[in-house]
Amino acid sequence: MADEQLDEKNLNSEEAGAVNGDARVQELEEQLAAAKDQSLRAAADLQNIRRRAEQDVEKAHKFALEKFAGDLLPIIDSLERGLELSNADDDTIKPMREGIELTLKMFHDTLKRYNLEALEPHGEPFNAEHHQAMAMQESADVEPNSVLKVFQKGYLLNGRLLRPAMVVVSKSPAPAQPSIDEKA
């Protein structure tokens, strides 16, 4: 009888151990799943950080010239204004004009090489993202909200606005006011 009780106790303790063992295995599996999930999240975070860092470096390379290019734009404007104001038919300044034209061409070629492009919106519809309206002018010749005149060219650096074009924008002509004679 004592042997039966001992066998029964051993059996009960083995069953209890098996139940405890199953619970322990389940607990360890849950911990393993949590650790795997945490590892995957950490790997994804690391990948996102690398991607963001690469994008930041790419942007830094693309737009490193932004300030320098912006400082060159007034020089280009002055050269262009000098050509506009000089008389092309005057033989005394012809060599100077040719020198300015060559210098300006070199500037434009260099700017193009570094993805700096001029915005010359004359005749185009007004675009608030790329143009700065300096004045409105009535015009029956063109569509309303079209660029009539460009005071200063705008520029894009790698597709991003560096300087807006300063423009005069057209508006519809005002309806004619009836004269005093027509009112009577």
UniProtKB/Swiss-Prot annotation:
Gene3D superfamilies on file: 3.90.20.20, Head domain of nucleotide exchange factor GrpE
Example GO molecular function: protein-folding chaperone binding
A single BP term in Gene Ontology: protein folding
Subcellular location: Cytoplasm
Region of interest called Disordered, as start-end residue ranges on this chain: 1-24
GO CC terms of this entry: cytosol
Coarse class of the protein's main subcellular location: cytoplasm
InterPro entries the record matches: GrpE, GrpE_coiled_coil, GrpE_head
Family label: Belongs to the GrpE family.
Subunit structure: Homodimer.
Protein name in the entry: Protein GrpE
